[in-house]
Amino acid sequence: MGLLSEFKAFAVKGNVVDMAVGIIIGAAFGKIVSSFVGDVIMPPIGLLIGGVDFSDLAITLKAAEGDVPAVVLAYGKFIQTILDFVIVAFAIFMGVKAINRLKREEAVAPSEPPVPSAEETLLTEIRDLLKAQQNKP
């Protein structure tokens, strides 16, 4: 089997395609969470602690000199990134928890009895007819 055909067999497997779709959706979800944290969560928190915008929090290690930009330790962006991570992790946890609950409900739900075959149906009818004949006086 050539290298190209092996790669093709690997790439078209369901798990690889599912993983690729998951990565793409995850990247888009990350952008949504970043916007949620930066635009919805952080402004009220900043307002509560005195109107501070977390993304602007930084410590200047060395001031700008001429064309050389300042050396800044931007810990506000780090705090915002941590909140992004916590919210994404919590959302994933809740999703996995919901999926596990659905799997447990499926496992607990009784399955319908199998449909009897034509032979079983015929034998049941014969049995019922024989019982009916025995019960006649």
UniProtKB/Swiss-Prot annotation:
It comes from the Bacteria. The keyword Nucleotidyltransferase does not apply. The keyword Zinc does not apply. InterPro entries: Mechanosensitive_channel_CS (IPR019823), MS_channel (IPR001185), MSC/AndL (IPR037673), MscL_channel (IPR036019). GO terms for molecular function: mechanosensitive monoatomic ion channel activity. It is found in: Cell inner membrane. The chain crosses the membrane at residues 9-29, 79-99. One of its GO terms (cellular component) is plasma membrane. PANTHER family: LARGE-CONDUCTANCE MECHANOSENSITIVE CHANNEL, MECHANOSENSITIVE CHANNEL MSCL. Channel that opens in response to stretch forces in the membrane lipid bilayer. May participate in the regulation of osmotic pressure changes within the cell. Belongs to the MscL family. This is Large-conductance mechanosensitive channel. It comes from Pseudomonas paraeruginosa (strain DSM 24068 / PA7) (Pseudomonas aeruginosa (strain PA7)).
